[in-house]
From Swiss-Prot:
This is Cyclic pyranopterin monophosphate synthase, mitochondrial. HAMAP family: MoaC_B. It comes from the Eukaryota. InterPro entries: MoaC, MoaC_bact/euk, MoaC_sf, MoCo_biosynth_MoaA/MoaC, Mopterin_CF_biosynth-C_dom. Residues 1-32 form a transit peptide. The gene is CNX3. One of its GO terms (cellular component) is mitochondrion. Abundantly expressed in the roots.
Length: 270
């Protein structure tokens, strides 16, 4: 009687015992070949590398956040970066050879940016404060070349362009351009110019117009941009006066030739 009763109890409990074993065995086989499960396993490994443990099977509520690897998580940085603060921050949180090289590169960028007077410490554009500088005599000479081609060159030489005197109009345009520099170049100062000269010369060797512009003032900042704007606007005006005859005209070699005055002293390309 007792033996029969034990057999009946065992048979009733047998499905409950075997079913989880069967499910576990079947699940293990399916998991090894199911790509979705494989992706989940890879995700779990990545989560473990970040948080120090795999997600709990009982849900996110049981995860032990006290064991997070804080070294993997860095605070968000402002978009306007103070490079000196960033360098100190990286020095305090990184120590490997690669990190040291990155810090050195970071410091070099910050040093280079400190030489750009129109760029602030956080990398933002700024207009330089020149109020502390002394007034001094300043000059700048710039030039450019407009290549016309032989046919257009001959028309300009003979003053046969439909719009009129090419060189005369371009000369006035260049002088006016120098006076408008602070309106055209956003971070330039509004300078009280004392003199502007623009000369245009036809060059038969390469069928071009050679343009030279000079600006001067007595003030706290230089006139390099005024001289370069003068020759640039003069060159554009030559193009505008001649474009009806040819579109194949190029403006080249816009550059500063020399400057004088100011704290940096004199400079010459020659």
């Amino acid at each position: 009687m007792i033996s029969t009763l034990r057999r009946a109890v065992f048979l009733r409990r047998f499905p409950a015992v075997v079913s989880p074993i069967k499910r576990a065995f079947s699940s293990r086989i399916d998991d090894e070949f199911d790509p979705q499960i494989m992706n989940i396993n890879e995700l779990n490994q990545e989560m473990q590398s970040i948080f120090g443990q795999e997600p709990s099977p009982d849900g996110p509520g049981t995860m032990d956040f006290s064991e997070l690897k804080s070294s993997k998580i860095e605070p968000l940085r402002s978009k306007n970066i103070d490079f000196r603060q960033q360098i100190e921050y990286h020095k305090s949180t990184h120590s490997s050879k690669n990190d040291s090289q990155a810090i050195e590169q970071y410091a070099k960028v910050a040093s280079d940016m400190s030489k750009l007077t129109h760029v602030g410490i956080a990398g933002e554009a700024q207009m330089v404060d020149v109020s502390s500088k002394d007034n001094s005599k300043r000059t700048a000479l710039a030039c450019c070349k407009v290549i016309l081609g032989k046919r257009v060159f001959d028309l300009v030489l003979a003053n046969q362009m439909g719009k009129g005197d090419v060189l005369g109009v371009a000369k006035i345009a260049g002088i006016n351009g120098a006076k408008q520099t602070s309106s055209l170049i956003p971070l330039c100062h509004n300078i009280a110019l004392t003199h502007v000269r623009v000369d245009l010369r036809l060059n038969p060797e390469d069928f071009s117009v050679d343009i030279e512009g000079e600006a001067s003032c007595t003030g706290k900042t230089g006139v390099e941009m005024e001289a370069m704007t003068a020759v640039s606007v003069a060159g554009l005006t030559v193009y505008d006066m001649c474009k009806a005859a040819s579109k194949d005209i190029s403006i080249t070699d816009v550059r500063l030739e020399r400057k004088t005055g100011g704290k940096s002293g004199s400079w010459s390309r020659l």
